[in-house]
Amino acid sequence: IQRIDHPGGVVRALQLTDTHLCRNAGGTLLGMDTDHSLRAVIELVKRERPAVDLLLATGDLSDGGAETAYQRLQGYLAEFDCDSFWLPGNHDERAAMEAVTAGSDCLSREIRVAGWQLLMLDSQVPGEVGGRLGEDELGFLESALVAAKSEGLHSLVCLHHHPVEVGCEWLDEQIVTDADAFFALLERFP
């Protein structure tokens, strides 16, 4: 469990997802320079919401799992004076993420801050586009929610793959395949 000191009150969390940074700066996805796109988002956040208490990077952080992409991401996120926490998406390589973030708490699965428990679930299925939580992640989620309930904490559950259809055919093909088990578990902890 990673604990973040916070004076209480409002916790300002910034979520970034699907940055798809390529192996080299200037790489493109669907014709878009992903480094440039992320830089534009960061500049917008710094202008409009400069106070950030923690940053959640929720998958597809790289487009092919290159360590160089994660190294650049680390540099970009260091512009915020706060902790950042990452989870993998289907385009990420966990081993490369671990290598780049070694010695940090970036890949913590459970974060506690100001009466909140943030849970970073791994819905990645290596080699697959779609997501699945599986017994291990669902077991972790259940244990964490039991603990949060007994300690009077609110919970925020984060994962890369969506558990509900969003009305986009190609994206809905990537839905979490065990979403029913996920929601059945969540319903036990209103």
Regions found by a protein language model. Give the residues of each.
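Active-site neighborhood of divalent metal-dependent phosphoester bond hydrolases
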Residues: 80-107, 114-119, 123, 127, ...
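Active-site neighborhood of phospho(di)ester-bond hydrolases with catalytic His/Asp-centered motifs
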Residues: 15-17, 53-60, 84-90, 122, ...
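Metal-dependent catalytic neighborhoods of phosphoester/phosphodiester hydrolases
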Residues: 25, 57-78, 93-106, 131, ...
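Alpha-helical scaffolding within the catalytic cores
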Residues: 1-2, 40, 96-109, 141-143
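His/acidic metal-ligating clusters that form di-metal
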Residues: 41-54, 131-190
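Active-site-proximal beta-strand elements of phosphoester/diester hydrolases
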Residues: 10-23, 115-125, 156-160
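N-terminal active-site segment of His-dependent metallophosphoesterases
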Residues: 1-72, 152
